[in-house]
Amino acid sequence: ILEDGAELTPIHIDDSISSLSAILLNDSYYDALLRGRDVIDGFSILRHSWLIPFKAKAWLDLNERNRRGEHVDSRNLKKHRNDIIRMAAELVLERCELPEEVKSDMANFIEEMNVTDQEIRNLKLRGVKAEDIRRLLTDMYL
């Protein structure tokens, strides 16, 4: 609800950045953003464990647009998924109590990400398998 005299001005956001770099978040993702932030010297910082659900949402949105036949740069799809795989494999993650909508999106991402052991090796991640990544993401977010 806008205050008296307030106006909305539509702005164009380049399609390649709109999925992750959203200006407006729905209530569930805004709640997740607040839950996952630390304030350091007056700056809000999103902890890395909480960045993963946002990257998963970006991947899901891009993947859905791709399925509908819209132009999606496949490098963006690959980047979001590979970033999540690297973070899960290389960082110590905290258990995140996600809002239900975000948790549902994470479950969809885990189900749809289709990572293989060969892709893990291609990322030069040693001592980790695709199933390890799926299990870790499930344990941390679901």
Go through the PLM ranges and name each one.
Residues I1-L142:
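Compositionally biased terminal segments of proteins
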